[in-house]
């Protein structure tokens, strides 16, 4: 009998909402030269092919910094930088063009592979490169001539859209021409950022050596707002980190996010499958830079009843929560606060006020199993406490059979039945024997 993989089935089912959401959207993928020379690059190419097969419109931007430095070293030349930007003289430009040209051919060849027994079998991907970008010189700064180092003058977004409409992957490198016919060396982060903005891309995706941005404890930060990302850039630059994939991408991601690109994702080029995990799972695997959080705490509406029921039913079946019917939920929905992530209800709690006694009950606290080790319960408690204070309540109580210590750690103390509102005392279930915990607001 063939072995069945329920993990594969569950993973595929969970990815379907993201497949549908991403289809027809434009993504700009930024590949630094470090990613291209890594042994995992073949897998990254396969995953790019997978995205294309799912109907995602792809613009791939590649850099060549380490390859250019190797070429310079082979000619006994030192790279020259001014204010952390490469100075590209005529000799260096030839080496830049050589490195960029070889990478373009290599990436195109890899994406064109459709041999049997390979992930791209039968893909038949068209890869298109061209003069989609017109450059101009950076000029002279503090007496230093950047020579053939340039910046973007304009982008022919209509031409790029035509290629994407014809189901091609657009491949763009770090060399662009000017209106005078000269060639200029551009930074891959500027190219990727400007393309994402001009094409109104849904996402910009970058690769670095780590799995994203980490905090001081070394834990991956799953989500950053532009201001926080800017602070992280400044911290890294203070330690002399100007050219890593993380810093270069974050610079671009901050600009892109502030210019209308909804999400920018930073993932590792060393991790096989990082691109797929980041885009087709609820929590991803790297760091995303966003203007608005993928997760929000808000009051529940009638449309949230299905999600709340799905969340609390397993806890009701285990006897952890008191059973609530759909009809009861419909009548009490205005009492509920939820945490929603990518249209999934991952946590909920209700506040039942007793205004005459200046006290409220926090009830029906539930957190999705995947998020119980995080701070969602704390977020709900803070929100419910805030709501209770706004109502003029002075105390908050809970009835619990399983989470006694959790509430005690947050300022609740054991209490007797007689502290409850009269109405609640009459309904107290002595068979269930829930512990009563009370906190001052």
From Swiss-Prot:
One of its GO terms (molecular function) is L-glutamate N-acetyltransferase activity. It comes from the Bacteria. PROSITE patterns: GNAT (PS51186). GO terms for biological process: L-arginine biosynthetic process. It catalyses: L-glutamate + acetyl-CoA = N-acetyl-L-glutamate + CoA + H(+). Keywords: Acyltransferase, Amino-acid biosynthesis, Arginine biosynthesis, Cytoplasm, Transferase. Its EC number is 2.3.1.1. Residues 295-434 form the N-acetyltransferase domain. One of its GO terms (cellular component) is cytoplasm. Pathway: Amino-acid biosynthesis; L-arginine biosynthesis; N(2)-acetyl-L-ornithine from L-glutamate: step 1/4. It is found in: Cytoplasm. Belongs to the acetyltransferase family. ArgA subfamily. PANTHER family: AMINO-ACID ACETYLTRANSFERASE, AMINO-ACID ACETYLTRANSFERASE NAGS1, CHLOROPLASTIC-RELATED. Homohexamer. NCBIfam families: N-Ac-Glu-synth (TIGR01890), PRK05279.1 (NF003641). This is Amino-acid acetyltransferase.
């Amino acid at each position: 009998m063939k072995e069945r993989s329920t993990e594969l089935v569950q993973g595929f089912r969970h990815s379907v909402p993201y497949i549908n959401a991403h289809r027809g959207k434009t993504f700009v993928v930024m590949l630094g030269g470090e990613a291209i020379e890594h042994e995992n690059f073949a897998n990254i190419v396969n995953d790019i092919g997978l995205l294309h097969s799912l109907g995602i419109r792809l613009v791939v931007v590649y850099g060549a910094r380490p390859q250019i430095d190797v070429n310079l070293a082979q000619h006994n030349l030192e790279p020259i930088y001014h204010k952390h930007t490469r100075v590209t003289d005529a000799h260096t430009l030839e080496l830049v063009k050589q490195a960029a040209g070889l990478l373009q051919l290599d990436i195109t060849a890899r994406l064109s592979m459709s041999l049997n027994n390979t992930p791209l079998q039968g893909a038949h991907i068209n890869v298109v490169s061209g003069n989609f970008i017109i450059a101009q010189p950076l000029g002279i700064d503090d007496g230093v001539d950047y020579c053939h180092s340039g910046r973007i003058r304009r982008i022919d977004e209509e031409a790029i859209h035509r290629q994407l409409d014809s189901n091609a992957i657009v491949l763009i490198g770090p060399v662009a021409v000017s209106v005078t016919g000269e060639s200029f060396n551009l930074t891959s982060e500027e190219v990727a950022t400007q393309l994402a903005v001009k094409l109104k891309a849904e996402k910009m995706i970058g690769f670095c050596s780590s799995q994203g941005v980490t905090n001081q404890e070394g834990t991956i930060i799953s989500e950053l707002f532009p201001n926080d990302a800017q602070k992280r850039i400044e911290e890294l630059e203070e330690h002399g980190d100007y050219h890593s994939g993380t810093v270069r991408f974050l610079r671009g991601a901050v600009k892109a996010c502030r210019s209308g690109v909804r999400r920018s994702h930073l993932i590792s080029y060393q991790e096989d499958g990082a691109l797929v995990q980041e885009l087709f799972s609820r929590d991803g695997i790297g760091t995303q830079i966003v203007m608005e959080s993928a997760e929000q705490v808000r009051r529940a509406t009638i449309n949230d009843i299905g999600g709340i029921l799905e969340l609390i039913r397993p806890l009701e079946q285990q006897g952890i929560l008191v059973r609530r019917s759909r009809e009861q939920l419909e009548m009490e929905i205005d009492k509920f606060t939820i945490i929603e992530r990518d249209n999934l209800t991952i946590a909920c709690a209700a506040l039942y006020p007793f205004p005459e006694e200046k006290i409220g009950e926090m009830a029906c606290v539930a957190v999705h199993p995947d998020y119980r080790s995080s701070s969602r319960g704390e977020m709900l408690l803070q929100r419910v406490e805030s709501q209770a204070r706004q109502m003029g309540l002075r105390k908050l109580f809970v009835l619990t059979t399983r989470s006694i210590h959790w509430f005690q750690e947050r300022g609740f103390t054991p209490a007797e039945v007689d502290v409850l509102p009269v109405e609640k005392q009459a309904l107290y279930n002595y068979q269930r024997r829930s512990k009563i915990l009370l906190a001052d607001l």
